UniProtKB/Swiss-Prot annotation:
It catalyses: L-glutamate + NH4(+) + ATP = L-glutamine + ADP + phosphate + H(+). It comes from Clostridium saccharobutylicum. L-glutamate binds at residues 239-240, 297, 303, 315, 334. The lineage of its organism: Bacteria, Bacillati, Bacillota, Clostridia, Eubacteriales. PROSITE patterns: GLNA_1, GLNA_ATP, GS_BETA_GRASP, GS_CATALYTIC. The gene is glnA. Glutamine synthetase (GS) is an unusual multitasking protein that functions as an enzyme, a transcription coregulator, and a chaperone in ammonium assimilation and in the regulation of genes involved in nitrogen metabolism. It catalyzes the ATP-dependent biosynthesis of glutamine from glutamate and ammonia. Feedback-inhibited GlnA also interacts with and regulates the activity of the transcriptional regulator TnrA. During nitrogen limitation, TnrA is in its DNA-binding active state and turns on the transcription of genes required for nitrogen assimilation. Binds 2 Mg(2+) ions per subunit. Residues 108-443 form the GS catalytic domain. GO terms for biological process: glutamine biosynthetic process. Belongs to the glutamine synthetase family. This is Glutamine synthetase. The record marks 62 as: Important for inhibition by glutamine. Mg(2+) 2 binds at residues 133, 188, 195.
Length: 443
């Protein structure tokens, strides 16, 4: 049941003195976009009459077919708590439509809605709980980000060593005021690294929340004179930032991953879901780990998952099944990072899990040993493959994965692969500091 009507939104804007409304949407590479309107244009926007030029957005459309229409999701209305009390700013998350009234196939939100519809046909809905890590960096005198962390704290440390505590507290308060249910907020393993966990929700709500979360974290950090970065590996030699994704399927109001008679407490559906993820993850890594930099995080030795295996306890495996059982039974995929587009990530992961269910796939045996300590020969003997080593490999695996194409649709798939291939080529042809340090004086 909808929380707000059109009239509710108009009244809330008037009663709260809102003067500006951001109509937000996301491009295929996960960048948040918005069209800002004044309160005078609100009714027009709520009547789905707000147009924008889609040819200016990465991966959307060509200039000759550029007209796009924004349709606000009324229940996403929220007032930004950190903006001025005079002339407040609110936002509405929008779906992108074509002028003929059909959903735009290049809208990441639409991609996830299609995946949800496929799950619904089988009687399932997916709940998701993300764990978003980020760094807080100092800025220079011009306000530009540095890689100087403002503390030397470690996992679960607190003030005075955790100098990000005040910023993290204000982020938490702002998120709660915007309707988030915050479950935990703490310093992470690396210096300057933080994590704020919020309650799980259905896949679409969670993807919306991840985009909102990143906006709030960056905005509040800026007010503290800091820069919040969701770059996966900004500093060599310390842990990078991940976005572990916890997933469960529900059917008829019950967790479909539960079987109390199984030795692990897992149902046949849970094992099939795990098998589908393991089968397809290499072909979807360019989505879950979309940057050149993403693969600097995915190396052994920094708690990041590299090897394709699953376990109930073993954190060196790509997929872990946390200890909670009953309604809390879930599967945790540990490779995604927070630079990814959450709509595309969840669409791909859901379709991969459904692929396992539809085709009755079975996962390999659980791996309980420390995979990082295994030799290459031992991993080979145990049938343990690894994720792509870089974005180039990930893009090539994606080109071979039919399910990734199905999950994203032709439009997003084609533009995404082309964009990531170009990104790798741009990186490949640049001269980097490492080359200068090692070669300039030597040769």
């Amino acid at each position: 049941m909808a929380k707000y009507t059109k009239e509710d939104i108009i009244n809330l804007v008037k009663e709260n003195g809102v003067k500006f409304i951001r109509l937000q949407f996301t491009d295929i590479f996960g960048t948040l976009k918005n069209v800002a309107i004044t309160d005078k244009q609100l009714e027009k926007a709520l009547d789905n009459e707000c147009m924008f030029d889609g040819s200016s957005i990465d991966g959307f459309v060509r200039i000759e077919e550029s007209d796009m229409n924004l349709r606000p999701n009324l229940d996403s209305f929220v007032i930004f708590p950190w903006r001025p009390q005079q002339g407040k700013v609110a936002r509405l998350i929008c779906d992108v439509y074509k002028p003929d009234g059909t959903p735009f196939e290049g809208d990441p939100r639409h991609v996830l809605k299609r995946a949800n519809a496929d799950a619904k046909e089988l009687g399932y809905t997916m709940n998701v709980g993300p764990e978003c890590e980020f760094f807080l960096f100092e800025t220079d005198e011009n306000g530009r980000a540095t890689t100087n962390t403002q503390d030397k704290a470690g996992y679960f440390d607190l003030a005075p060593t955790d100098l990000g505590e005040n910023a993290r507290r204000d982020m938490t308060l702002a998120l709660e005021e915007m309707g988030f249910e915050i479950e935990a907020s703490h310093h992470e393993v690396a210096e300057g690294q933080n994590e704020i966990d919020f309650k799980y929700g259905d896949a679409l709500t969670t993807a919306d929340n991840i985009m909102t979360f990143k906006l709030v974290v960056k905005s509040i950090a800026q007010r503290h004179g800091l820069h919040a970065s969701f770059m996966p590996k900004p500093i060599f030699g310390i842990n990078g930032s991940g976005m572990h994704v916890n997933m469960s399927l529900f059917k008829d109001g019950k967790n479909a991953f539960v079987d109390e008679n199984d030795k692990n407490g897992l149902s046949k559906v849970a094992y099939q879901f795990i098998a589908g993820l393991l089968k397809n993850i290499k072909g979807m890594a360019a989505v879950t780990n979309p940057l050149v930099n993403s693969y600097k995080r995915l190396v052994p030795g920094y708690e990041a998952p590299v090897y394709l295996a699953w376990s109930c306890k073993n954190r060196t495996a790509l997929i872990r099944v946390p200890a909670a059982r009953g309604a809390g039974t879930r599967v945790e995929l540990r490779c995604p990072d927070p630079s990814s587009n959450p709509y595309l990530v969840l669409a791909c992961l859901l379709q991969a899990g459904l692929d396992g269910i539809k085709n009755n796939l079975q996962p390999p045996a659980e791996v309980e040993a420390n995979i990082f300590a295994m030799t290459e020969q031992e991993r080979k003997e145990n049938g343990i493959d690894n994720l792509p080593n870089n974005l180039y490999e990930a893009v090539n695996y994606m080109k071979e994965n039919e399910l990734a194409k199905k999950a994203l649709g032709d439009h997003v798939y084609g533009n995404y692969v082309a964009g990531k291939a170009a990104e790798w080529d741009d990186y490949r042809t640049k001269v980097h500091d490492w080359e200068l340090e090692n070669y300039l004086n030597k040769y």
